[in-house]
């Protein structure tokens, strides 16, 4: 199935925010339902959730959006890109859309942003899903090498024109090898089109500076960490057996630091993109957790 067939039933549009300019969103579901925001990882875009937005829209008012500097949202070059700015972007987006409270789910960098948002704007949160989230300690040598590898693969896609193969290599890092068949030409070419835009290339060194810093440090850590002990909301660590950087033991070590935490490990073999690699299982877990607090 193509991305646009997956998006049938969703509205793709742009909204203006005070500090972050034009933001691309994908929206589905009834607006009187509980809101659910979906956030992608570093270098990502709303297509990461193409398989989830419409199905989850049967239960929630779903909004996925491109971070500033990402996807087809505005590319600002007059700011730095710590993870905290994406939390502020989410707050402004909620304000513009007239949404007072929402469930928040983020993958990778989006998971880190979820944790930062929950601490900074607790009154705006319902339940949280930290999906293969960044912002927790890396505890293995393999995890540190995974981070260095990600930075290296990313660097091949800016500063010079990206290619189909350079994009494909970076996207293969995201997905468990047994699921590489899910990387369609359409998905790879969609990211290639985004990364080839002059505004993206101009902004990329700022967006990816956090990866470059991590590589220089040997992959020992990333800038910005979640203050898990300060998260008051119910939070689900949604993990996979083949997650790069942070393996299951890293999630298990983070779990006791959450006051109201749960851990779910995907039954299907997945890498860093469980929402794309096993959407039916992912969506079922999300719906059950956000409606009942159980997994």
Question: What are these language model-derived features?
Answer:
Residues 225-270:
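Conserved loop-alpha-helix segment in the C-terminal half of the alpha/beta-hydrolase fold
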Residues 260-295:
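Catalytic active-site module of serine/aspartate enzymes centered on a nucleophile-bearing elbow/loop
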Residues 119, 126-165:
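Flexible "cap/lid" loop of the alpha/beta hydrolase fold
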Residues 26, 64-109, 113, 120, ...:
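Active-site loop/oxyanion-hole signature of alpha/beta-hydrolase fold enzymes
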Residues 3-22:
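N-terminal cap/lid segment of alpha/beta-hydrolase-fold proteins
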Residues 19-72:
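Conserved HGGG/HGGXW glycine-rich cap/lid loop of the alpha/beta-hydrolase fold
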Residues 161-227:
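Conserved alpha/beta-hydrolase catalytic His-Asp/Glu region
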Residues 48-50, 73-79, 139-142, 248-249:
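Conserved catalytic-core motifs of eukaryotic protein kinase domains, centered on the activation segment
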């Amino acid at each position: 199935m193509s991305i646009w067939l997956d998006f049938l039933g969703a509205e793709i549009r742009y909204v203006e925010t005070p500090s972050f300019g034009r933001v691309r969103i994908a929206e589905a579901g009834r607006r009187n339902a509980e809101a659910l925001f979906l956030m992608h990882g570093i270098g990502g875009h709303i297509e990461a959730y193409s398989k989830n937005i419409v199905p989850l829209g049967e239960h929630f008012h779903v909004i996925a959006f491109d971070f500033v500097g990402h996807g087809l949202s505005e590319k600002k070059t007059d700011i730095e890109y710590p993870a905290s700015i994406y939390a502020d972007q989410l707050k402004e987006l909620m304000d513009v859309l007239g949404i007072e409270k929402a469930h928040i789910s983020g993958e990778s960098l989006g998971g880190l942003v979820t944790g930062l948002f929950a601490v900074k704007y607790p009154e705006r949160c319902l339940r949280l899903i930290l999906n293969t989230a960044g912002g927790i300690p890396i505890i293995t040598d393999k995890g540190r090498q995974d981070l260095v590898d990600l930075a290296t693969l990313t660097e091949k896609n800016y500063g010079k024109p990206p290619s189909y193969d350079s994009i494909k290599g970076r996207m293969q890092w995201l997905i468990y090898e047994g699921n590489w068949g899910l990387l369609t030409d359409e998905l790879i070419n969609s990211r290639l089109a985004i990364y080839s835009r002059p505004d993206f290339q101009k902004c990329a060194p700022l967006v990816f500076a956090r990866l470059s810093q991590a590589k220089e440090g040997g992959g020992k850590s990333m800038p910005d960490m979640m203050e898990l002990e300060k998260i008051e909301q119910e939070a689900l660590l949604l993990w996979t057996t083949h997650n790069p950087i942070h393996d299951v033991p890293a999630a298990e070590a983070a779990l006791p630091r959450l006051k109201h935490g749960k851990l779910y490990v995907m039954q299907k073999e997945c890498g860093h993109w469980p929402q794309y690699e096993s959407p039916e299982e992912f969506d079922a877990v999300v719906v059950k957790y956000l409606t009942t607090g159980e997994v």
